[in-house]
Amino acid sequence: MATQLTTRARRATRVSRKGSQPASKQDVKQVVKSILGQSLEHKRANLLLPPTVVNTTGNIYCLTQFVIEGDGISQRTGRVINLEQMVLRYRRTLDTTSANSGFLRYIVFLDTQNQGTLPAITDVLSSLDVSSGYEVLNAQQNRFKFLLDEVESLCASATNLSKASTLTFNQKVQVHYGGAADAATSNRRNAVFFLELSDKVATGPQTRLGVQLKFTDA
């Protein structure tokens, strides 16, 4: 059967100004890709992290490891997914007891070389400072692919005490897993992470992050 399909594909023709010509392999691939794309089931998964205080030690979260293996609409059937869209709803509020303004940095990135770990913030940045550059060794090896890197101020005033953003990423990427569970040990190539860091030693800003993923099984 496979031989017959291959033979038919090779004999497929297309119409051009000069008449009928054999279809190229690229033409056949595009047709097959289109048919398969229409038949794939698109899945969605949501994650809502609890309110968190951000200080000079920072926080880092994996945004893809919560997609566990299973048969549900929010689960994956194997060890690879095609991530098509990621929407982040990020809210941050300066602590009301703080009389001084503060800076907050947040970064969204892929770990292209992950092997079952949660990276340390100092794997990403050269120091625990809002103005720090990227850690040089991992930057040299192109370990991380950065999708967003922002620094903003939260002022101790009624006009700039809180901020909220909806961040949409439509970059398509294959995310790999090494296990079935929601655990750091399941993280593999192209796991997506969120890093947040402030310049407040104490009474840092409080943040909350909601995540929605749209994906297909690979």
From Swiss-Prot:
Subcellular location: Virion
Chain positions covered by the region annotation Disordered: 1-26
Keywords from the named record: Capsid protein, Virion
GO CC annotation, single: viral capsid
Basic residues composition-biased segments: 8-17
A GO term for molecular function: structural molecule activity
SUPFAM superfamilies reported in the protein's UniProt record: Satellite viruses
Protein name per the record: Coat protein
Organism lineage: Viruses, Riboviria, Aumaivirus, Maize aumaivirus 1
